[in-house]
Amino acid sequence: MARWRPDTAEREATPEALYLRRREFLALGAAGAVGLLLPRGARAGEPTGAALQVARKVDQAGGETPTPWDSVTGYNNFYELGTSKEDPSRNAGSLRPRPWTVTVAGEVKKPQTLDLDALTRMFPLEERVYRMRCVEAWSMVIPWVGFPLGDLVRRLEPTSRAKYVAFQTLLDRDQLPGQRRPVLPWPYVESLRIDEAAHPLALLAVGLYGRVLPGQNGAPLRLVVPWKYGFKGAKSIVRITFLADRPHTTWNDAAPDEYGFYANVNPEVDHPRWSQARERRIGEFFRRKTLPFNGYAAEVASLYAGLDLRKNY
């Protein structure tokens, strides 16, 4: 059976500049990369944006110090707003996060279109401090604000046929000017198995540092899956589709030998062009060891019992 794809002709675009920024990052080398990091003694900027009412705060990063606001909001991968790390923050003003709706479709008993403000009122918001590991071998610690994805999944009542959940980013060349270039086949789509989506660690984020989510970080709604590489976290979500079969996903389609469907953080499975055994924490000079499942093995390893994680990377 053919895999599900987003219903748009944009998926046919040729990804002519696929590796542009990822290669640039590698070419910087250790000395050049240091210039992108905040010095250890630098004073971080204060969080901006409207404050969110948070019901509880949970540290799920083992007491590690959160990455400063300046770095979390100024060093981003969001190709829809540009392919350099600084482009998303420069171009985020074009994104209009209100009004915003999310369409739920597919193998679900309660298909509907949800207003984002109504959606966020359904569930108490939590602040969760998570590690974030990029596939490019850098990392952050981020205090996200959101609600468990699993709570929404259960409320929508998936049918017995639902095995996967796909998340689709907004397709709008005016709001997301990076979509004017065929860097990737737009719109961006990512997916989880339904048991992954229902796991308590999976989060739909609407903010960070207690404030509404900035555009460059995927406003107004993004997926956060802390045991997976960052590209699994779809941003500016407008559609959630429950599916019987595994769907096409953007990076896995574009370069399947480099970006696996599962994308679990695994220091023993290298990217074809660099090691995944160590990472550079933004704000630090020396690399640190990468932890299996990004440090969340105790919580999530059982999801993959019996699965060859070298083949299913």
UniProtKB/Swiss-Prot annotation:
Cofactor binding, per record: Binds 1 Mo-molybdopterin (Mo-MPT) cofactor per subunit.
Record keywords, A-Z: Metal-binding, Molybdenum, Oxidoreductase, Periplasm, Signal
Gene Ontology molecular-function annotations: metal ion binding; molybdopterin cofactor binding; oxidoreductase activity, acting on a sulfur group of donors, quinone or similar compound as acceptor
Disulfide-bond pairs as recorded: none
Matching InterPro entries: MsrP, OxRdtase_Mopterin-bd_dom, OxRdtase_Mopterin-bd_sf, TAT_signal
Keyword check for NADP: no
Modification comment: Predicted to be exported by the Tat system. The position of the signal peptide cleavage has not been experimentally proven.
Keyword Cell division belongs to the record: no
GO BP: any one term: protein repair
Main location: periplasm
Protein's job: Part of the MsrPQ system that repairs oxidized periplasmic proteins containing methionine sulfoxide residues (Met-O), using respiratory chain electrons. Thus protects these proteins from oxidative-stress damage caused by reactive species of oxygen and chlorine generated by the host defense mechanisms. MsrPQ is essential for the maintenance of envelope integrity under bleach stress, rescuing a wide series of structurally unrelated periplasmic proteins from methionine oxidation.
Cited HAMAP family: MsrP (MF_01206)
Family recorded in the similarity comment: Belongs to the MsrP family.
Protein name, per record: Protein-methionine-sulfoxide reductase catalytic subunit MsrP
Organism from which the protein derives: Anaeromyxobacter dehalogenans (strain 2CP-C)
